[in-house]
Swiss-Prot record:
Additional information: The basic functional RuBisCO is composed of a large chain homodimer in a 'head-to-tail' conformation. In form I RuBisCO this homodimer is arranged in a barrel-like tetramer with the small subunits forming a tetrameric 'cap' on each end of the 'barrel'.
Record protein name field: Ribulose bisphosphate carboxylase large chain
Gene behind the chain: rbcL
GO cellular component: chloroplast
Binding site for Mg(2+): 194, 196-197
Catalyzed chemical reaction(s): 2 (2R)-3-phosphoglycerate + 2 H(+) = D-ribulose 1,5-bisphosphate + CO2 + H2O; D-ribulose 1,5-bisphosphate + O2 = 2-phosphoglycolate + (2R)-3-phosphoglycerate + 2 H(+)
Amino acid sequence: KASVGFKAGVKDYRLTYYTPEYQTKDTDILAAFRVTPQPGVPPEEAGAAVAAESSTGTWTTVWTDGLTSLDRYKGRCYDIEPVAGEESQFIAYVAYPLDLFEEGSVTNLFTSIVGNVFGFKALRALRLEDLRIPPAYSKTFQGPPHGIQVERDKLNKYGRPLLGCTIKPKLGLSAKNYGRAVYECLRGGLDFTKDDENVNSQPFMRWRDRFVFCAEAINKAQAETGEIKGHYLNATAGTCEEMMKRAIFARELGVPIVMHDYLTGGFTANTSLAHYCRDNGLLLHIHRAMHAVIDRQRNHGMHFRVLAKALRMSGGDHVHAGTVVGKLEGERDVTLGFVDLLRDDFIEKDRSRGIYFTQDWVSMPGVLPVASGGIHVWHMPALTEIFGDDSVLQFGGGTLGHPWGNAPGAVANRVAVEACVQARNEGRDLAREGNEVIREACK
């Protein structure tokens, strides 16, 4: 008679995938999940289920398990810790062997780690709080096309935050008038203007017309001010081919920077564009449209710091990162946490800032965080203090809303940022004397 190889039936995940004795390897990809199990599901089982379903596991033993080495390939839940103040919630730490992931593919990384497991019945909710990307994996990515230092050298702008402005009204202007608004802002003293994330190629303004008029505006403003100027030309499109066509046209016009919506456009498209940008000397501005769909819920989804790390690997020179100003204090530390993850080489684990793992980017270029959305001149001292020099501050309504027009609005922003930087360099406390600094600058 045939010998029985294994027992059929539903298996407890924790027998295989919960391994508290496991010592993590330097090459492992580590994940911190906030798990809210269904009533009656023990934490070990829920944590193990997450590890299993996001790596090798299925709900039962299959005979092909005998053809592979589970020990080599399985994800492991190696630690579980309760969340302070939450009864039925805990953080599950999962280690994934490096070989589970395709090199240089953020798409594959996400498909594995967050692809399937979030719809799992045994869990009420699941949130990916942080990922530790080992150098062995991050080294397979190009990363940002240029990074902070190269961007400053290209633009010849040092020692202060860069200034931008989103052209409003975002939809409905003709290409010619759009270019006119761009010119006014750049002439007034901004470094960049920006296409709104949803400006692609609509009936009232086709992309090619916009690109041509914006290039004209940039050249005119550069000639008048003697400074290098840019406009984030949004290359996001319905197909990757069309996106590349727009990026190539931008390069032919000789503009310094293009833009992409990396979440709606997708990581595959974004990585292709980032490679093109590095090969052709274009800077790449990244907008995070759709991020709140993924990161806004406290108990479910994915924290933005994970999306930020993914963007640094996929590639972008700027990415939107919230403003802090006017939000809660606690938000400030967390925002600064992922701002550091974008800019720095080495970031220590620091739970108070939401950083669950020490992250070593080795030599991958940094990304400039962009503060944008509802900010204006009076926020400038706070922004300068919070973000420091390596940032882009974007004032849409805060420039175009100036009662005298775009150029005076731009002048106001430029004067304010120069005043704040000077005051800070002279040792004044921007948090306390900020309003005074701005008032003096007004004169």
